[in-house]
Amino acid sequence: MHIIALSELQFHNYSNLHSKKNYKQSVEYAKLKESNGYTPLYLGLVDSGNNVHAATLILEKKINNKYRYGYVPNGYLIDFYHLDLVKTFTIELKSYLKKLNYVYIRVNPYINYQVYDSDFILKENNSGIIKELENLEYNFISNTSKYKMVLKATDIRSTYQNFKRSLRRNINNCLKKGITVYQGGRQDQQDFLNLVGNQERYQKIIELFQHPQNYFEFYLAKIDPETYINNYRYLIKKEQLNNDRLNRKLKDPRIRKTKNLVERKMTSDHLLTTYNNELINGTNILKKYPSGVIISGVGIIKNQQEVIFIKECYTNEFKYIRSVPMIKWEIMKKAIMEGYHRFDLGDIVITKNQITKTGYNGNIIEYSNSFDLVINELLYKFNGFAKKRPK
């Protein structure tokens, strides 16, 4: 077997059929990165019958007029656990890239390195793959691993019930505030772009990712202040009746003043205060935005295999409402009905006191660190490329 250059169409067709397909190993992503100065290189490992057994997109940049390096986003389109195939691919790839004066390529394999539950308890350990790749002369670049929250859903009801209580409460609070979610169309593109930080990038994503195998969609959350006000008027009226009833019991000398009764009255008082504050907030929003206001958005890519959440955005004014989880849930409900069962909810942030996105109760996937495949050892060491990251 040997490496050949694939046409854009050949790579497009192969990548769409591969079990490891992902939006970064795609023609669409290559075109997106061209605006950052990268040149796409599509390569495939073929046998004597010209059948493709593995392929990769390499995003190439020149170091000078002669030498170049490459970046392989989300790794090769290959079964990394088929070690003989990975070995053959690596040997042939090094030979091919040497002729093109490559110094090295940096690979971010799309491998489930470690799998944890939402409480960060280890469920699956695939760390042995690191040693196998090192045996094939891949240089391990430490401290570059990423964590994502991945959820496998079967149906709407059980998926929602499996969410942690805090997330379900957040979604319900958004409903009380009159927040609705809708899929954006062409007429809503600017509303979405106004929310994101890099408008030019997402304008290109909207334009490029229009193939059914890599399709970008965006969804927006909007507050209807009249619904917000009406919901809390109803809740105040309902809770006031409960509060009056509890108050009568506390004043009735014939009724024992138990700890439970006192606590229920205190809870009711607290709810009334909260509801009245929400009513004031809703009234202020109505005065400022009588027709409602868009407060957040989410961008996704669907590839007929999974839904990948690639962008969360919101206005600073309404950041406190935390409406993004509600958008995600509405997207998931729609996608489940369309036959999707795997949801990549995006990168999670791990700090000393918090791990984000755990409310979805999915699996935390730690993707393997980066590896450098060195083509020209002398130039690689001389220029200190091991300490650098592709821009």
Label every model-predicted segment:
Residues P109-Y110, K148, Q183-Q187, K311, ...:
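Acidic carboxylate-rich catalytic motifs and surrounding loops in phosphoryl-/glycosyl-chemistry enzymes
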